[in-house]
């Protein structure tokens, strides 16, 4: 059956130019009047044009007409205005009219793009949706229905699309045209999807007072121990001291501060930084960038992720070059296009539209939090039991792959593993949960990624150097291993190496899971945690990761015009050329020769000697890219000082690089994240609270470390003094996480 034809009305009923209307309420009223005047003849037949749906209205002649909207860019709109019919509008492709009006303020551009792409026959981009054309067409015209998963609290919503084709034989009248007034997201930061609460905004709201809470006169201030001087522990110490706690002691088993915020400096090149831990910092990490700005460390540059810079791909014995900002080589384009289509179009699961990742990002960005909750819950419902591998197979090997092109099972999956989703090959983490990887995308952690020119460890160093109440946090830190933590009545005993015991009122633990379970012995009884929290600690998956850096005499990739990123299926996996001093192109260079995860990292543990490992990696890169590998020699021939490596799995203080949930394990993150909230229930509150990125929904990201530090700090302030609830709230800053009305998800254990 043919679609609707497209003809402009006669001169007497020319479409109304609404280009000057920039208010959604006025646009709604204007469109209502235009449609009502044209298609209703009696007052009784008038209708109200709502924001949620476009009406069907009788013309009084037995015909029922629907109001729908075509979305186009400015150029296409002008071509259609100049033509008397679609056939005269050269270059205009087949269009689709949908029943989503341009004044809907709960409908983002990304969601509109998804609906149009799924209802139409063409692929559109965001720039194609800047203008609308309002059309009336018979309700009997051929159409397609798209059903969404839960939307804005309702069970579902249906969208209707009418194909507008050159061959159509159903009249379609243009009524008006104008600017699309649907909101367009533009912020760099937004709440993370599992929380729907912006910790960055909370810290901003506290900036004027310089504290997140305080202790009223007459309230006994607690004696507090913080186990671990990673970033979470240092943030908590700083916030507690600023809130007025006088007695804070930080215990750190290693000889340095900062945990996984660890920047190695080279003696011969002090401006060159090897980030042994966290090295990629997305702009969406609002908490991190709040602290960077607060401490004068906002000098950042773009991280050279694959495709953002010239990239070499070595796959099955052949070398491919991927120019910066362009499409990847032809061999990889099917999987690249499929993934990009998934980001825009989401997935049709058994006929139900699951919101695209970009639509979820827009909902978060625009503050449509109920909508974001519904979108994310739908993905949890349908995909939480999937690994990333099985989820990708389900989508792209099935009958309705995003983008419309089905993948070949083995070859395309291998290509996708090598190419990754933005930050390099994801093959080693394919058995992680699908939701866990999707979480990275939705939280914006794969986009707009930065590096810190000063080195990220400068941030914990500056926090630790703050002098509060006459002493710095560094001076309050004891470098010793905590061996055991136990409870005695309403006090908590900390036993350190050597047998000494200190007694505290409140304890914040930021240690890794292995230390919590095997050294501190916190899960061996129910003295501190409910059984489900202990289970989460014992069963959360920590990812192994290895890095090896090389300081070179020159930035050879600039001088010889070589790719600054290499992805290989060999041992090295991912190679990055890093420039921490771009103002000096003749200065020393830094190459992250190998960054590996999981099984790829485990292989390297067989070669612990860094010189031997370097030689192996250099040979591997030489097979893939000999012109690059020949420049891989340490500056000044100094192998001892100018090659550095670290294996996070064998680090006794870490027990892994970061938490990465397996399928079905997202409930562990929920249990760990909300553990400090027990303080609001006196019968459950044991005075010990968890923090650290591994206790968040975003393991491995600084954002999660700060969020959990904030939770624990608020819990300590709230729980001190045994006051009435009303008083508790008075000495915590308004809008704090304990007072927030959390909208929890249904995670499936």
Swiss-Prot record:
Gene3D superfamilies documented for this protein: 1.10.405.40, 3.90.660.10, FAD/NAD(P)-binding domain
Nucleus keyword on record: no
Cofactor binding note of this UniProt entry: Binds 1 FMN per subunit.
Pfam family, one: Amino_oxidase
InterPro entries according to UniProt: Amino_oxidase, FAD/NAD-bd_sf, Flavin_monoamine_oxidase, Glycosidase, Trp_2-mOase
Residues where FMN binds: 232, 252, 260, 280
Annotated disulfide bonds: none
Organism superkingdom: Bacteria
Family per similarity comment: Belongs to the tryptophan 2-monooxygenase family.
Identification of the protein by name: Tryptophan 2-monooxygenase
